[in-house]
């Protein structure tokens, strides 16, 4: 048989078909030889063999028929085999596709991971670039500073050439800092206090400890110039390397050549006393020029600060001049034995003092220009108490003092007095100020951006005081006896002046511009308090005037005064114009505010003025007999005129409120018989307190008029 029934490779699924084909093959007589011979051959070979048998004419028809049925069965078998091969190939392709798809998924996830890593790397790269740029910038800045520091010593010859000429012409002295081990030489020079030295060769310099902030900052190149008033240098930043001072003694000292210091920065520090006048010579980029004519012993020490000071001394005995740390320019011609000291601050001081024995002057903090002329036969002493002092107490029978404290002030003072003048100013944050002494006039120009021009002429002791603020004051005082002025400035706890007889005192405060002329044989007084004031005062009084002003934020103010001293206290932002004329006690006080006051005072004996300003806790004036007191409070502009003999009493007040003028520039004058005293009075029936301008009690409606300040009625 040609085909087997169980052979699935034959391509036939039905046995009947297989049986029929086998019978046909066997019936023709050819047998299964052709089917078996081409079972495993491809279809092409089967077809070629069948074509050869059919084409052969010698092969009987029955054999041709049997070979044809065998070829048909082989064709089905070949088709089945090819199908199986195709299925196998399809399965294999499917497996390959699945494998490729899995590979693509893996590559996709890997690609996403690579993208994330790329973004992180890019961010890190940007950060690294920013840090690198910052480091490069810092490197460039530090390199620039290093180059500046390296180039800085090259500027020393240029500065020397610029400064050597003016110093040689003016017999001045400027020096470079010495090493630390040479400080002992400077301190040792104090032993030669009373000896006259010609041109000194030792140069004084005391370097302070280097601050870390000063080391970090780069110093700018110095630009030296010989002008006397340079702009102030900021204290919060490291300044130019200082050109430290040198002590020059002798009537005609030769100029010391200028030398530039090393590249260190020397901040301000405490300095030892040098010389026979106990003067300190700190550092602060300064230039000093001193001209001395007809003087025996002169010592000039110029301290810290971008200051330029010019001092001329004329006299026969001893002159001394020392400006302390600050940006100051000072011109001081002295005669005989004056002593001048200009402490801390950016100030320009022009002082001329002429006397016969021994005046002393010292100009403290502030950018100010001051011209002071003192003419008198005896001794004048000027002393300055600097910032943050707790208390200041000046005592002495014959020691005039002059004080010009902190502030951007320009004051011009001429003082001509014969006995004693004492000037004292206790500056900011002072707890207490108490001047005592029988015959001590004072002259005080304290804190503030003030410009005051003062002329004091008289045989004994005039006084003129202009306190805090942008003040411009012009004062002429001519009085023969004694004047005392005391000013306790801002944030002072208490101010208690205790004064004996014949001590006039006046204290102007605030941002004021005052013009004062005081003329009289004994003791005029003029006070202009805080505020943007412009006051013009002329005072002619023969004997004594006393004025005391305790400024803003003071806890208490208690003046204690002798007899026959009138007192007047206007408070607030006021514009007052007061003329006081009388034979005994003139006084003129203009307190805080934008004041413009014009005062003329002519009185002969004693006047006392007390002003307790805004924000004071308590004000308790205690006065002896024959001392009237007036205290107008608030934001007021008061205008008053008083003319009185030794004592005066408040007049009967009308049922009218005192005129309060809120416009500047107006004036009010009253006769001596009609001077009002605004004092509250107490009703004798209902004990209610009424204002001074009321004629009837507001509570019980009963008419009564006060006659004195103690609250009694008539």
Curated annotation (Swiss-Prot):
GO terms for molecular function: mRNA binding; zinc ion binding. Keywords: Metal-binding, Zinc, Zinc-finger. Residues 307-320, 366-378, 495-505, 557-567, 636-646 have a biased composition (Basic and acidic residues). A zinc finger (RanBP2-type) spans 677-706. Transmembrane segments: none annotated. Residues 379-392 have a biased composition (Basic residues). PANTHER family: TESTIS-EXPRESSED PROTEIN 13D, ZINC FINGER PROTEIN. Belongs to the TEX13 family. This is Testis-expressed protein 13D. It comes from Homo sapiens (Human).
């Amino acid at each position: 048989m040609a085909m087997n029934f169980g052979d699935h490779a034959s391509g036939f699924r039905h046995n009947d078909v297989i049986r029929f084909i086998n019978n046909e093959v066997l019936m023709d007589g050819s047998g299964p030889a052709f089917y078996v011979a081409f079972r495993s051959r491809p279809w092409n070979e089967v077809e070629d063999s069948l074509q050869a048998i059919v084409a052969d004419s010698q092969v009987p028809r029955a054999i041709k028929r049997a070979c044809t049925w065998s070829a048909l069965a082989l064709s089905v078998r070949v088709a089945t085999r090819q199908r199986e091969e195709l299925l196998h190939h399809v399965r294999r392709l499917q497996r390959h596709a699945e494998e490729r798809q899995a590979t693509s998924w893996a590559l996709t996830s890997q690609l996403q991971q690579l993208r994330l890593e790329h973004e992180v790397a890019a961010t890190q790269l940007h950060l690294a670039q920013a840090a690198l740029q910052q480091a490069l910038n810092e490197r460039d800045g530090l390199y620039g500073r290093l180059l500046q520091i390296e180039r800085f010593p090259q500027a020393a010859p240029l500065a020397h050439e610029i400064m050597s000429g003016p110093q040689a012409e003016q017999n001045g002295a400027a020096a470079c800092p010495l090493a630390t081990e040479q400080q002992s030489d400077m301190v040792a020079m104090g032993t030669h206090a009373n000896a006259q030295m010609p041109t000194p060769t030792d140069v004084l310099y005391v370097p302070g400890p280097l601050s870390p902030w000063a080391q970090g900052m780069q110093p700018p190149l110095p630009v030296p110039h010989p002008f006397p008033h340079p702009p102030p240098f900021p204290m919060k930043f490291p300044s130019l390397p200082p050109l430290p001072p040198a002590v020059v003694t002798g009537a005609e000292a030769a100029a010391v050549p200028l030398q530039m210091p090393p590249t260190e920065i020397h901040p301000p520090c405490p300095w030892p006393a040098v010389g026979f006048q106990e003067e300190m010579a700190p550092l602060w980029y300064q230039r000093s020029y001193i001209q001395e004519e007809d003087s025996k012993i002169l010592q000039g020490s110029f301290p810290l600060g971008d200051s330029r000071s010019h001092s001329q001394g004329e006299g026969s005995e001893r002159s001394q001049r020392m400006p302390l740390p600050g940006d100051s320019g000072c011109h001081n011609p002295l005669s005989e034995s004056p002593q001048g000291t200009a402490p801390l601050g950016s100030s320009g001081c022009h002082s001329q003092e002429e006397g016969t024995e021994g005046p002393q002057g010292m100009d403290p903090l502030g950018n100010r220009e001051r011209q002071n002329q003192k003419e008198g036969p005896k001794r004048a002493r000027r002393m300055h108490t600097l910032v943050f002092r707790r208390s200041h107490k000046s005592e002495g029978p014959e020691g005039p003092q002059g004080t010009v404290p902190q502030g951007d002030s320009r004051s011009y003072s001429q003082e001509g007095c014969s006995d004693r003048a004492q000037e004292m100013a206790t500056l900011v944050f002072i707890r207490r100020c108490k001047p005592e002494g029988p015959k001590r006039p004072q002259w005080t120009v304290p804190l503030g951006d003030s410009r005051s021009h003062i002329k004091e002429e008289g045989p004994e002791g005039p006084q003129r005081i202009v306190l805090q603020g942008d003040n411009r004051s012009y004062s002429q005082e001519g009085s023969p006896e004694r004047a005392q002025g005391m000013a306790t400035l801002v944030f002072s706890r208490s101010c208690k002046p205790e004064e004996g007889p014949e001590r006039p005192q006046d204290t102007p405060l605030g941002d004021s511009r005052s013009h004062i002329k005081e003329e009289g044989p004994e003791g005029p007084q003029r006070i202009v308090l805080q505020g943007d004031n412009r006051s013009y005062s002329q005072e002619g009084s023969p004997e004594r005037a006393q004025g005391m002003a305790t400024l803003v934020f003071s806890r208490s103010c208690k003046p204690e005064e002798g007899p026959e001293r009138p007192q007047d206290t206007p408070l607030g932002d006021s514009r007052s114009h007061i003329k006081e004329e009388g034979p005994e006690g003139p006084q003129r006080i203009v307190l805080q505010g934008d004041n413009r006051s014009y005062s003329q005072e002519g009185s002969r004996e004693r006047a006392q003025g007390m002003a307790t300003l805004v924000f004071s806790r308590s004000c308790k004036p205690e006065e002896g007999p024959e001392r009237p007191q007036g205290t107008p409070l608030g934001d007021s502009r008061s205008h008053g005129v008083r003319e009185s003999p030794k004592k005066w009493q408040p007049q009967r007040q009308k049922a009218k409120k005192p005129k309060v003028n809120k416009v500047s520039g107006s004036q009010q004058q009253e006769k001596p018989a009609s001077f009002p005293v605004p004092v509250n009075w107490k009703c004798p029936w209902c004990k209610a307190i009424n204002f001074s301008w009321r004629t009837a009690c507001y509570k019980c409606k009963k008419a009564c008029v006060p006659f004195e300040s103690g609250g009694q009625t008539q």
